[in-house]
Amino acid sequence: MQREPALDPQKLAAIRAPFDRLGGARIEASVLQPLSLLIDLAGESLRARLFVVQADGAEEMALRPDFTIPVVETHIASHAVSGLYRYEGAAFLLAEPGSDQPSEFLQIGAERFGVSDDPLDDDAALAALAFEAASAGGRQDLELRLGDPALFAGFVAALGVAPPTAARLVRAFRSQRALHQELTPDRQPAAASEGSDLSDILAKMSEKDAARLLGEVWRLSGVQPVGGRTAEDIIHRLALRAEAARAPNLTAGQSDLLRRFLQLSDRPGRVLDAIAGLAKEAGAELDLLLDTWAKRLAKLEARLAPQWGGVHLATAFVRPFGYYDGMVFDVESRALGPDLPVAAGGRYDALVSRLGGQPGAVGCMVRPGRAILGLRP
């Protein structure tokens, strides 16, 4: 396993300092995480890059690819309504084939939980924290890229897309290939054979009977559901997916508007203006969503005024981990390019709820090995 080179202690301390000033509890997160939980929460595409271990007769575990899920678990176990946590340690993610990137690397980060009086300010504060910490490594070419899956979901809904089709689009948003297929007006429906035999059987039953059967299958096989989901939750999700698969395709006009929406990448104010123009063209109502984003940008600009010229909003930008559902961001170096972010983060309210906690969560992390100028990333 390729590791990062040794990091300069003084520069590492400078990167750590903004997190120390933030305060909160310093925690040690579990290195091993249940593989099924990671895949369920972060997405199937992550599987090929995980380091998986398994003892005889035990469930498959994976080395943590980042800290978010283990920190969420720590917070929920504390039974606290709100919390602020800092962490520092190694994360593990197999490098892409042909890449010279390390598969073991240091992360420093923070996660904030709980219902806030001003969640927009929390978003701005964590993004500014990430930028400040990333800048402490000496790079002068950093930029901040913003995105929000909720912007896409809101635009889809405003176009009057049928709810099952809209749900299908939102799921596809994290995959360029899947989204391209969805935006094709003559898209062919998914073949029925794509599901498993069991899921096909369950889909033909009432939700109540299907949940009872699935529970019996679990009992007989000794299987434990992951992520705190009940049989009823899973059956309801299968029913929604089956409904989405049968949903009508987009019209040519809807597809064209969505393609133009996804091409937007510019200074944040210009992107919001362009979205407003598309909404007006479609006769859609997006004022509330755009007003919320305008307020978020004002708070960000107040915290990042000297760096504001390097802030961009991209409507197609999405974090690789599938649990982010609000504003997301990458701090990028022009020298390293967008595929090697120096820092990253975002809002993931629904993840905490899915694991049994109270909604409200935003966090960020920095990769010191990329932040330190002159160090091979």
Regions found by a protein language model. Name each.
Residues 4-34, 66-79, 83-139, 195-377:
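Positively charged, Gly/Ser-enriched RNA/tRNA-binding surfaces
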Residues 39, 98-100, 155-159, 376:
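Short acidic, glycine/serine/threonine-rich loops at helix termini
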Residues 41-60, 68-80:
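An N-terminal, globular interaction/scaffold subdomain
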Residues 47-57, 160-194:
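Acidic, His- and aromatic-enriched active-site or binding-groove loops in soluble protein domains
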Residues 78, 85-87, 142, 146-151, ...:
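RNA-interacting cores
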